[in-house]
Amino acid sequence: STKNGRDSNSKRLGVKVYGNQPAKAGSIIVRQRGLTFKPGKGVSVGKDYTIFATQNGIVQFESDKKEKIISVY
């Protein structure tokens, strides 16, 4: 028998709502490990670094020199 053959379940991370798409309050925009995307206006961060909308609006991805910021307007 082999000692290999194990793998963890995928965690389904990544962007769930893309730029210029509508988001309702409470809807998840990004699932991430660590703050790859930083929160802007109209969004908040959960304890597992999930970024979610706090208001209804359109998702906008903005980038400074280093930071990627997500906002909902």
From Swiss-Prot:
Main localization category: plastid
Subcellular location: Plastid, Chloroplast
Leader sequence segment: none
InterPro entries: Ribosomal_bL27, Ribosomal_bL27_CS
GO terms of biological process kind: translation
Pfam family, one: Ribosomal_L27
UniProtKB keywords: Chloroplast, Plastid, Ribonucleoprotein, Ribosomal protein
One Gene Ontology MF term: structural constituent of ribosome
One GO location term (cellular component): chloroplast
SUPFAM superfamilies assigned: Ribosomal L27 protein-like
PROSITE patterns assigned: RIBOSOMAL_L27
UniProt entry tagged with the keyword Disulfide bond: no
Similarity comment: Belongs to the bacterial ribosomal protein bL27 family.
PANTHER family per the UniProt record, alphabetical: LARGE RIBOSOMAL SUBUNIT PROTEIN BL27M, RIBOSOMAL PROTEIN L27
Name by which UniProt lists this protein: Large ribosomal subunit protein bL27c
Source species: Chrysochromulina alifera (Plankton alga)
